[in-house]
UniProtKB/Swiss-Prot annotation:
Keyword DNA-binding among record annotations: yes
SUPFAM superfamilies reported for this sequence: SPOC domain-like
Organism field: Geotalea uraniireducens (strain Rf4)
Subunit structure, as described in the record: Homodimer. Interacts with LigD.
Highest taxon of the lineage: Bacteria
Function: With LigD forms a non-homologous end joining (NHEJ) DNA repair enzyme, which repairs dsDNA breaks with reduced fidelity. Binds linear dsDNA with 5'- and 3'- overhangs but not closed circular dsDNA nor ssDNA. Recruits and stimulates the ligase activity of LigD.
Alphabetized Pfam families for the sequence: Ku (PF02735)
Molecular function terms from GO: double-stranded DNA binding
Organism ancestry: Bacteria, Pseudomonadati, Thermodesulfobacteriota, Desulfuromonadia, Geobacterales
Keyword DNA damage: yes
NCBIfam families with a match to the protein in the record: Ku_bact
Keywords associated with the record: DNA damage, DNA recombination, DNA repair, DNA-binding
GO biological process: DNA recombination; double-strand break repair via nonhomologous end joining
Family: Belongs to the prokaryotic Ku family.
Protein name: Non-homologous end joining protein Ku 2
Length: 256
C-alpha cells in the first residue's frame, strides 16, 4: 500500500499539464535503537558543544560556515542561503525523452508513485504513450526547497518518478585500479553454465533481510529474559586463483 501524499503538482510537457499526487514507493522500516545512559538506562539527548569553550550552544547562537582551510570558515547567513534556494514550483517539467533502459542504473536513486489528482485528464494517455514508445521522460522539479532531476516512467497502469543522481555525483570507474587476469576457455564455459543453471525470473519475495530478522529475534529473546550466546563470526577467505576452476566445477555439480 502506497504511503500518504507527500507532494502535489503537475506534469508539464509540450502544452499539456497533468495533475498528480506524489507517494513514496518504498519504505525504510528498520529496527532503531535509542542511545541510553548505561548507568540508569535513561534516554540521552545530543547537544551542540563549543569545541573551544566546552559549553552547550543554543540554536539562536548557531550559524553555518564552509571550511576553506583548517580552522578558517566562510560564514553564510540564513538570508544569504535563502537567496540560493530554488524557486518554489508545483511543476514537473519534462525536458526530453529517452528509450527505456537507456539510463545507467548507477544514476537511479529514490522512486515514487504518481497518482492522478482530481480525476486528472491525460494521465492514462501519458502512461499508454510512454509504454507504446518504450520511453522515459527526463524531468526536473522542486520539492521541499530542493531541485531534483528525475525519470518519468510507465509501469503497468501507473506513472513512477525515479529521482536521478546528477552526473557530477557519480564516481567514474576510471578511478579504480583494475588488474586483468587471463581466463581460460574452460573456466569461461563452466562459469557460463553455472550462471545459466542459476538463471530464473526475479522474485524479490524470496529474499528477506536476514540481519533485521536476527535483530528482531534477539530483542524478543532479551524481552523474555533469555541468555544470549555470543558466537564468533565465521571468517571467509577468497578462493585461490589456482583452485578457481575446481571450485567452479564443484558449484556446477551442486546445481546440476
Amino acid at each position: 500500500m502506497a504511503g500518504g501524499t507527500i507532494w502535489k503538482g503537475y506534469i508539464h510537457f509540450a502544452d499539456t499539464d497533468v495533475a498528480v499526487k506524489l507517494h513514496a514507493a518504498v519504505k525504510a522500516e528498520r529496527i532503531q535503537f535509542h542511545l541510553l545512559h548505561k548507568r540508569d538506562h535513561v534516554k540521552l539527548h545530543q547537544q551542540m558543544i563549543c569545541a573551544y569553550e566546552k559549553i552547550p550552544v543554543p540554536t539562536e547562537a548557531q550559524t553555518k560556515g564552509f571550511e576553506v582551510e583548517e580552522g578558517k570558515y566562510i560564514i553564510v547567513d540564513p538570508d544569504e542561503l535563502e537567496q540560493t534556494a530554488p524557486e518554489s514550483s508545483r511543476m514537473i517539467e519534462v525536458h526530453e525523452f529517452v528509450k527505456t533502459g537507456q539510463i545507467d542504473p548507477i544514476f537511479l536513486d529514490r522512486v515514487y508513485y504518481l497518482e492522478p489528482d482530481l480525476h486528472s485528464e491525460g494521465y492514462s494517455e501519458l502512461v499508454g504513450a510512454l509504454q507504446e514508445m518504450g520511453a522515459e521522460g527526463i524531468c526536473t522539479w522542486t520539492m521541499r526547497n530542493r531541485s531534483y532531476l528525475g525519470a518519468l516512467q510507465a509501469s503497468g497502469k501507473i506513472l513512477r518518478l525515479n529521482t536521478l543522481r546528477y552526473a557530477d555525483e557519480v564516481i567514474s570507474v576510471k578511478s579504480l585500479e583494475l588488474q586483468e587476469s587471463p581466463v581460460s576457455e574452460k573456466e569461461l564455459k563452466i562459469g557460463s553454465d553455472l550462471i545459466n543453471q542459476l538463471t530464473t525470473p526475479f522474485q524479490p519475495q524470496k529474499f528477506e533481510n536476514e540481519h533485521e530478522k536476527k535483530l528482531q529475534k534477539l530483542i524478543e529473546k532479551k524481552a523474555r529474559g533469555e541468555k544470549i550466546a555470543l558466537l564468533r563470526p565465521r571468517l571467509l577467505k577468497p578462493t585461490a586463483s589456482d583452485k578457481l576452476l575446481q571450485a567452479l566445477e564443484e558449484s556446477l555439480k551442486k546445481v546440476a
